């Protein structure tokens, strides 16, 4: 299901919605988002790669695909970042400066599971979110945030 998106105007309003499903090769089996009934189908899991929802100032997925909305249609909303970052040492406070721009986002908060690139990045997310939300939330982040090496079929060397 190709997800529609848009660019934003300077005032934050959405320009017209872009849908690229019709640009994909005919050999691919795709489903138009307008014909897929999320409520009736209720997928076991939905994977998202865009955590920003309404907080991205330049682009946005269609609001239907915001994490808070998708969560109602599945028992397992999974966020996997579309980007890879340089490794962050959890004790390096300077590295935390940019983390609010990709960690404190709705996709992370609403996801049931967050899969990051490494154990070190997992610890950085947990440390940042615990510091931001309070020590009493640490277990929530420890259970929610995982990485490839913790998922048997994704283990990498």
Predicted regions and their residues:
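Active-site and donor-binding regions of nucleotide-sugar-utilizing enzymes
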Residues: 1-149
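Short, conserved secondary-structure transition motifs
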Residues: 147-157
């Amino acid at each position: 299901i190709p997800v529609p998106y848009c660019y934003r105007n300077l005032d934050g309003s959405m320009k017209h919605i872009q849908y690229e499903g019709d640009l994909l090769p005919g050999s691919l089996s795709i489903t138009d988002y307008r014909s897929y009934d999320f409520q009736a189908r209720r997928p076991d899991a939905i994977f998202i790669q865009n955590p920003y929802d309404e907080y991205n100032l330049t682009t946005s997925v269609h609001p239907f695909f915001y994490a808070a909305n998708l969560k109602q249609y599945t028992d397992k909303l999974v966020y996997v970042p579309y980007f890879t970052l340089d490794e962050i040492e959890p004790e390096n406070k300077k590295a935390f400066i940019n983390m609010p721009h990709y960690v404190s986002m709705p996709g992370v908060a609403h996801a049931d599971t967050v899969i990051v690139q490494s154990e070190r990045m997992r610890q950085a997310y947990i440390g940042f979110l615990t510091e931001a939300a309070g020590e009493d939330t640490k277990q929530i982040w420890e259970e929610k945030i995982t990485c490839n090496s913790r998922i048997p079929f994704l283990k990498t060397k």
